[in-house]
Amino acid sequence: MRYLPKQLAILCGWLMAMFSGFSCAKDLIVGGYPSYPPVEMRDPATGKSVGFDIDFAAELAQEMGVKITFSETAFAQLIPSLQTGRLDFFLSAMNDTAERQKHLTFVDYLRSGTQLMVLSSAAVQGNTLKDYCGKKIAASRATNIIAQLNEWSDKHCTQAGLTKMNVVGAENNIDARMQLKQNRVDAMAQDSLTIPYIQQIEKGVFTTVDQPINFSYMGMGVSSDNVPLQKNLQQALQKMIDDGRYAALLKKWNLPEVSAVPAALINSKPATAL
């Protein structure tokens, strides 16, 4: 019988789940998009991807007893590449949403909120989110942050008789920060888990506004029919949480403690509840 790559990955996962000593010779192909520091970024000296996701994947591979090969994949192509079998799973801090769960399954490994950043020199514009009603705000169009801001703006700006936020799409978070530096926007919206790192490498440049909103989970994307791989990833992550390796990686990459998941989750639910 001839198997397609996706079918082989599922078969391999079932065998690994059934036999604790079993290991597949085939590498797991892991997709990622290096434009989200410090979760995943490109080292300018080597051109290689580095960051939390890279170290996290290495620990997962060691725990699972498999080898992984990274495949740089544009963010918008991560789900299609998973569906066609070009990837076994992906790591790119993608938000776990009900809409996306129609197409894949998430093993959640981080959590984050949405927070505004402004130039420190322009922080006098306001200290609360409401102060930015009517202002121009950049956000990555590849994420659900734009929808979150528009929803918040409808509720807290429009309903209060204030002008709605003018949320504009950016190519990614790097582009959004560039628009802010060039004074093309008044603020930018960023996942809160990445802000401490950005403030560390660009000291004094950016200031946060108010507290994060809309905390949500971010997950590893896995094919919905590859239940064995979902379980293997969930079990490996739980072991890393239990023995402290997960917390050590968060600290290494300066991710805030609130970014940690309390337990290994699947589709934002405890795996035991599925």
Go through each PLM region and give its residues.
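Extended ligand-binding regions for polar small-molecule ligands
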Residues: 54-63, 122, 129-144, 219-258
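Ligand-binding cleft/hinge of the Venus flytrap
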Residues: 43, 57-64, 145-169, 199-203
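Short coil/turn segments
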Residues: 35, 45-48, 95-96, 119-124, ...
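Extracytoplasmic small-molecule ligand-binding "clamshell" domains
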Residues: 26-93, 102, 169, 232-233, ...
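A ligand-binding cleft/hinge motif common to bilobed small-molecule-binding domains
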Residues: 77-80, 94-102, 148-152, 181-215
